[in-house]
């Protein structure tokens, strides 16, 4: 049986555990601040955690992990995939956590120490396109979740995944397809009479975003298949889940969308509103959307992709 510490970390997402042991007043980089303290605040934190655990399980199932294998988690973040993988490769296995955030790697190391599993983990600080601290043909599986959307050169990342895999090694990943929502209205609501104000808010939102965020919108599921095929992966499979839903939402849902960025590289909608509109205009803009939310239902669009495959023996 795996050590009790692994079971404790494999059941909930790591973030629910790290929030309790990470110093809240520590100066953190934007990635760790968002993953450990911002993302799960508000009324939908528990729902988000449950959603991420479902993703984790699907990614790990499709990686086909076995006891004794070595696994690389690229963009390991708060350790959601890594600690789940550790449970599956016990005994004798090893999980390598790779992230660009030293703060997140330190948080995961602290949790591993608390759980008594630090000997089964290693940490490296590399970009997904340059895994230079991971030797050629050294791991049995590469896993990743919501990482490639931040990477401009996705083909280079796929080539690095291929390089570090042993013959017969596997890849398994999850990515949101953000381009699927480009044609939808903000909040899923037609701006109607506040369309001129909404246009200014959208312009301000785009101006506040770093240039790198374009990487989130310039690919779809076909691009994922292409770059991994070109990198030398075989037996590739991809599952696309797309939905358009019209549901009644609460004002708490609307406030969460206003105040919490969906990733650490973009501003909040409230910041964009403040940058674009006068206080009176902002009040008019928000009052319109609040009435629309209260009247419901609201249309939401989402698309996500799971990709998995292997390299030749």
Name what the model sees in each region.
Residues 16-69, 80-88, 103-107, 111, 172-201:
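Conserved class I S-adenosyl-L-methionine
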């Amino acid at each position: 049986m795996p050590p009790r510490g692994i079971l404790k970390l494999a059941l909930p997402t790591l973030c629910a555990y790290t929030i309790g042991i990470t110093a809240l007043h520590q100066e953190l980089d934007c990635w760790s601040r968002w993953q450990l303290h911002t993302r799960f605040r508000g009324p939908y934190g528990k729902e988000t955690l449950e959603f991420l655990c479902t993703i984790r399980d699907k990614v790990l199932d499709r990686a086909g992990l076995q006891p004794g294998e070595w696994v690389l988690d690229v963009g390991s973040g708060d350790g959601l995939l890594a600690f789940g993988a550790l449970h599956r490769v016990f005994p004798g296995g090893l999980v390598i956590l790779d992230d660009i955030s030293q703060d997140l790697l330190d948080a995961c190391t602290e949790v591993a120490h608390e759980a008594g599993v630090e000997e089964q983990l290693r940490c490296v600080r590399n970009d997904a396109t340059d895994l230079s601290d991971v030797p050629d043909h050294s791991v049995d599986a590469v896993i990743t979740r919501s990482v490639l959307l931040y990477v401009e050169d996705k083909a280079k990342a796929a080539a690095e995944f291929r390089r570090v895999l042993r013959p017969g090694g596997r890849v398994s990943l999850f990515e949101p397809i953000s381009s699927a929502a480009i044609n939808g209205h903000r909040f899923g609501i037609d701006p109607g009479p506040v369309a001129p104000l909404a246009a200014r808010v959208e312009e301000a939102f785009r101006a506040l975003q770093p240039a790198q965020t374009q990487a989130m919108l310039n690919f779809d599921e076909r691009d994922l298949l292409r770059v991994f095929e070109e990198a030398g992966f075989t037996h590739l499979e991809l599952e696309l889940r797309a939905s358009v839903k019209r549901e009644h939402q609460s004002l708490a849902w609307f406030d969460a969308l206003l105040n919490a960025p969906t990733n650490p590289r973009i501003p909040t909608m409230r910041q964009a509103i403040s940058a674009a509109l006068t206080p009176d205009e902002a009040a008019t803009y928000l009052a319109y959307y609040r009435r629309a939310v209260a009247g419901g239902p609201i249309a939401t669009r989402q698309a996500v992709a799971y990709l998995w495959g292997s390299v030749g023996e």
